[in-house]
């Protein structure tokens, strides 16, 4: 695999960097004894963002490593590896799983993550 990040990996990396900053804001909220419900909302926003990053990585894996493995005759092993990777990921396998849509650009209706640093 190439050392250069794919567009999807860059998107996931950028999202994770945003999450890191958001988590720092949540820590500050807790340290300043912020209202519990406000903290819970921010934690939910981070969880949602992590789930989106995971979906982006799934799309990337399917388009790169997985497809290469299938073309190279290692399809069954690739399928087993993928099943093992997602079986404990409710956002990918649960009743509300959203695997479709724009993985990199995100949908136009998606709301941006609130900025916890201003809380």
UniProtKB/Swiss-Prot annotation:
The lineage of its organism: Bacteria, Bacillati, Actinomycetota, Actinomycetes, Mycobacteriales. InterPro entries: Metal_Tscrpt_repr, Metal_Tscrpt_repr_sf. Transmembrane segments: none annotated. PANTHER family: COPPER-SENSING TRANSCRIPTIONAL REPRESSOR CSOR, TRANSCRIPTIONAL REPRESSOR FRMR-RELATED. Disulfide bonds: none annotated. GO terms for biological process: negative regulation of DNA-templated transcription; response to copper ion; response to silver ion. It is found in: Cytoplasm. Changing residue 61 to A: Loss of ability to bind copper; loss of ability to dissociate from DNA in the presence of copper. This protein has an antiparallel four-helix bundle architecture that represents a novel DNA-binding fold. The keyword DNA-binding applies. Keywords: Copper, Cytoplasm, DNA-binding, Metal-binding, Repressor, Transcription, Transcription regulation. Copper-sensitive repressor that has a key role in copper homeostasis. It is part of the cso operon involved in the cellular response to increasing concentrations of copper inside the bacterium, which can be highly toxic. In the presence of copper, CsoR fully dissociates from the promoter in the cso operon, leading to the transcription of its genes. Binds to a GC-rich pseudopallindromic sequence, 5'-GTAGCCCACCCCCAGTGGGGTGGGA-3', in the cso promoter region. This is Copper-sensing transcriptional repressor CsoR. Residues 99-119 are annotated as: Disordered. GO terms for molecular function: copper ion binding; copper ion sensor activity; DNA binding; DNA-binding transcription repressor activity; transcription cis-regulatory region binding. Homodimer. GO terms for cellular component: cytoplasm; plasma membrane; protein-DNA complex. Belongs to the CsoR family. It comes from Mycobacterium tuberculosis (strain ATCC 25618 / H37Rv). Its main location: cytoplasm. It comes from the Bacteria. Induction: Highly up-regulated during the early stages of invasion of the human blood-brain barrier. The keyword DNA-binding applies. It holds the Pfam family Trns_repr_metal. Cu cation binds at residues 36, 61, 65. Changing residue 52 to A: Loss of ability to bind to DNA. Gene3D superfamilies: Metal-sensitive repressor, helix protomer.
